[in-house]
Amino acid sequence: MLPSLALLLLAAWTVRALEVPTDGNAGLLAEPQIAMFCGKLNMHMNVQNGKWESDPSGTKTCIGTKEGILQYCQEVYPELQITNVVEANQPVTIQNWCKRGRKQCKTHTHIVIPYRCLVGEFVSDALLVPDKCKFLHQERMDVCETHLHWHTVAKETCSEKSTNLHDYGMLLPCGIDKFRGVEFVCCPLAEESDSVDSADAEEDDSDVWWGGADTDYADGGEDKVVEVAEEEEVADVEEEEADDDEDVEDGDEVEEEAEEPYEEATERTTSTATTTTTTTESVEEVVREVCSEQAETGPCRAMISRWYFDVTEGKCVPFFYGGCGGNRNNFDTEEYCMAVCGSVSTQSLLKTTSEPLPQDPDKLPTTAASTPDAVDKYLETPGDENEHAHFQKAKERLEAKHRERMSQVMREWEEAERQAKNLPKADKKAVIQHFQEKVESLEQEAANERQQLVETHMARVEAMLNDRRRLALENYITALQAVPPRPHHVFNMLKKYVRAEQKDRQHTLKHFEHVRMVDPKKAAQIRSQVMTHLRVIYERMNQSLSLLYNVPAVAEEIQDEVDELLQKEQNYSDDVLANMISEPRISYGNDALMPSLTETKTTVELLPVNGEFSLDDLQPWHPFGVDSVPANTENEVEPVDARPAADRGLTTRPGSGLTNIKTEEISEVKMDAEFGHDSGFEVRHQKLVFFAEDVGSNKGAIIGLMVGGVVIATVIVITLVMLKKKQYTSIHHGVVEVDAAVTPEERHLSKMQQNGYENPTYKFFEQMQN
């Protein structure tokens, strides 16, 4: 009976694995999925035949972000409407992985956790509920968490009910691979123990079977240890040789025979993640070396439950494996781990670990999180032309460091839960609360480091933009001062300067957009500062472009080109203004450090030199024509002094309305509130950081608020006075004074009279008496 039930459950799970949502996958044999293994080409499921296929372009390998995974799903399934991705619940075994540049390979098998590409509108999974099992679900609309978080929630809930997690699925998507709830099925411990080995049910509380050795290692004999070690060694040799064959041959790989001499395999094996030995070394030395290695998660991001032998404790403990890399101290089950490493004494292992193992420096683990100063290295290194690449690497190192620390905490959490099985519920909750606080602390620390990274990157980008703008302005003024000036060369230099200014504006808008996505309140606070900074950019461009019309001959010749440039960029200016005025849009969370906006076109927008600043001033203002500029009969531009500010003076050319413009003055200009149209202007240092405040534009708002406050206070006072007068108005009730010595009948009658009752007989006699 039990074997039949197990077969039925297996068949049902298989049908569900091939099951396709009815909304967009009708008629497909398999669900769209992708799988990644770092160092090999990505794999995707062929929805027509249900087989895994390599990346069609032959170039794409493992992807580090959820946004990238979603984009890759949309690339490999262009005919489907992929709207989201979610990590699969179970790992799968996939064959024929290829290196980059090859599209068809054989014999390469890896176990990975794929990502499901969700089609159309999200539909929750239909979970099978076996007999004696319970279907539960949890939703929290105030949180938006990953697949791993909800898996942990489901597992903890089942554990509190003394049951095992049988199956689960996500509910209520709120972002890319993020959800607001989980549905799950909890089954009694006895039901789960029928389908797995009894030792696993007692020692391993994991609800997922990750594959592995099915042989019974209960005896733990020396012969079986030798057999296991040799089998693993041969498998590693075969994989390494197959990798070498890919680099030499163009055809399909052929599986290597196990009889190949160890000497040849050892010469080609250079990775420290695997331990090879020659025929002269004993198997005991191999086992000691394998079991003495520290647990390695590897560079990949999967969270696969595995076991490794801990030298200090002398037993096998659980940890999370990333899915690639690592070393051979990595076992599917605790029983398998103890069968290999349990027969080796702790003293010999400690002796082995005290001696440094030979390592190839070229094959050290690729996870940079092991270095505590991974981010500090970026912060201490000055910025250069490769700032963006350095920032991306530092961001990746930071995320790798965070993942490694989270993996360590999850391993400790898993071990603590296993040890707290028989403790009271209060102690279990204390353990859970402790690790939840630890996880929150790590998340907060990572968020602070991300913020520091972004701020440093912003400051360096601002410095680079200022340098480029200053250099472009110097070249533009030099071209104007040339004798004779070349109009087209002047226009090219002007165009480069305008582009530099637009880079500044684009960077400002990117920063504002990022703040608006992650913190709308802060965006509302800095909005006026951003507008002020944009005004400074426009005024600076206005002053710079006015220099062109000091040379009428040059300005007249390139007037059409300048007009065309302005007309081309006018539409983009309208979009910028609309974005600044519009309400902040809702984003799916904080996955992106810096939103990647498309490269924008350059824009030339001029503002009036004087007058109050308003949103209308941001509209494109066509440059004044050549006829409106006083003629410069000498066809010269005012000489520009590049000396420091202390060594140069301000001289105004009569009738021009412009000062003797310098590079630093235009690049760092901040218009004073008192200057007139025909007078010189004061030059101040104005950085890209938003510290300026538009005081003038707030006067009207302050006056309006004061008047409104007076009106509201008046209304409140009048209302209070009226209410108080109403309280003192007299309330008349018909109360009849009753003697305390009267009879109960008379007292009852008096109460009736108080309530409005009038006896017709009494009324008749009263009228008679009157």
Swiss-Prot record:
Modified residues (Phosphoserine): 198, 206, 441, 730
Sequence motif: Basolateral sorting signal, positions: 724-734
Site (described: Required for Cu(2+) reduction): 170
Phosphothreonine modifications at: 729, 743
Mutation effect (residue 760 to E/F/I/K/L/Q/R/V/W/Y): Greatly impairs interaction with DAB2
Pfam families in alphabetical order: APP_amyloid, APP_Cu_bd, APP_E2, APP_N, Beta-APP, Kunitz_BPTI
Chain positions found as Sulfotyrosine: 217, 262, 336
Keywords: Amyloid, Apoptosis, Cell adhesion, Cell membrane, Cell projection, Coated pit, Copper, Cytoplasm, Cytoplasmic vesicle, Disulfide bond, Endocytosis, Endoplasmic reticulum, Endosome, Glycoprotein, Golgi apparatus, Heparin-binding, Iron, Isopeptide bond, Membrane, Metal-binding, Notch signaling pathway, Nucleus, Phosphoprotein, Protease inhibitor, Secreted, Serine protease inhibitor, Signal, Sulfation, Transmembrane, Transmembrane helix, Ubl conjugation, Zinc
Transmembrane residue ranges: 702-722
Effect seen on changing residue 743 to E: No effect on MAPK8IP1 binding
Region of interest called Interaction with G(o)-alpha, as start-end residue ranges on this chain: 732-751
Tissue expression remark: Expressed in the brain with expression in cortex, cerebellum, hippocampus, olfactory bulb, neurons, astrocytes and microglia (at protein level). Expressed in the retinal lens. Expressed at a low level in muscle cells (at protein level).
Effect of residue 756 to F/H/N/S/W: Greatly impairs interaction with DAB2
Glycosylation sites (chain numbering): 542, 571
Domain BPTI/Kunitz inhibitor: residue ranges: 291-341
Membrane topology: Single-pass type I membrane protein
Amino-acid positions noted as binding Zn(2+) 2 in the UniProt annotation, renumbered to this chain: 677, 685
Function: Functions as a cell surface receptor and performs physiological functions on the surface of neurons relevant to neurite growth, neuronal adhesion and axonogenesis. Interaction between APP molecules on neighboring cells promotes synaptogenesis. Involved in cell mobility and transcription regulation through protein-protein interactions. Can promote transcription activation through binding to APBB1-KAT5 and inhibit Notch signaling through interaction with Numb. Couples to apoptosis-inducing pathways such as those mediated by G(o) and JIP. Inhibits G(o)-alpha ATPase activity.
Complexes and interactors: Binds, via its C-terminus, to the PID domain of several cytoplasmic proteins, including APBB family members, the APBA family, MAPK8IP1, SHC1, NUMB and DAB1. Binding to DAB1 inhibits its serine phosphorylation. Interacts (via NPXY motif) with DAB2 (via PID domain); the interaction is impaired by tyrosine phosphorylation of the NPXY motif. Also interacts with GPCR-like protein BPP, APPBP1, IB1, KNS2 (via its TPR domains), APPBP2 (via BaSS) and DDB1. In vitro, it binds MAPT via the MT-binding domains. Associates with microtubules in the presence of ATP and in a kinesin-dependent manner.
Name of protein: Amyloid-beta precursor protein
Encoding gene, per UniProt annotation: App
